[in-house]
Amino acid sequence: MHRPCPTYTCCVTDALVRHAYAAHAAEYTRVLGAVDDMHQLDRRRIERWSGQLSGPVVDAGCGPGHWTDFLHQRGVEITGVDLVPEFIENARIRFPDVPYQVSSLRALDLADGSLHGVLAWYSLIHLAPTELPQVLSELARVLRPQGHLLVGFFEGESAEPLDHAITKAYYWSIDQMSRLLDDAGFDVLDVETRQDHGKRPHAGIAAITR
């Protein structure tokens, strides 16, 4: 079932993020909207994760839709959802065989337990520390038992703001993100990190619902 945005503050945050990305959607897509331009370890990580999936999947916060198409090309039954209409319009043009929808991750228009997987690849970084637990619970709601989640984020001191090019974002430590996942009903399966010279530390956590 669809759940309404829970608070006025959350809806304001969504509006700010939507506006910020809408203003940079064309540039963002040009610079970061192709899988070939992504780090090869990210490509391998997501492709390996996708091998476990056997049912409907959502790319939660799909942005320009490139990872959605990447998984679609590998036979995954996937839909991309994003808060930013400009991203969705562009994705539908670039990848016409893939379904995309405008939606907030706080209130997905999906039935309980309807998904086998959720990809949240750097799409949770703009959530304030007080907001992230509710969104993780929403992702757990739409996943079936033993459903798969893959989260990508910038690793650092938890809830510390980072200098993001588009709008305010936050670091998370692996320990804290793992605790939040546990609180939301997930069991962590594995963690991978990478550190590129002169760049922010990156982390990915694979988890399943209990």
Predicted features and spans:
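Conserved class I S-adenosyl-L-methionine
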Residues: P6-L53, H66, E157
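Class I SAM-dependent methyltransferase SAM/SAH-binding core
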Residues: V58, P64-A107
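A short acidic, Gly/Pro-enriched loop at the edge of an enzyme's catalytic core
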Residues: R106-V118
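A short SAM/SAH-binding and catalytic strip from SAM-dependent methyltransferases
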Residues: H116-E131
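Acceptor-substrate binding/catalytic loop of class I
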Residues: E160-Q176
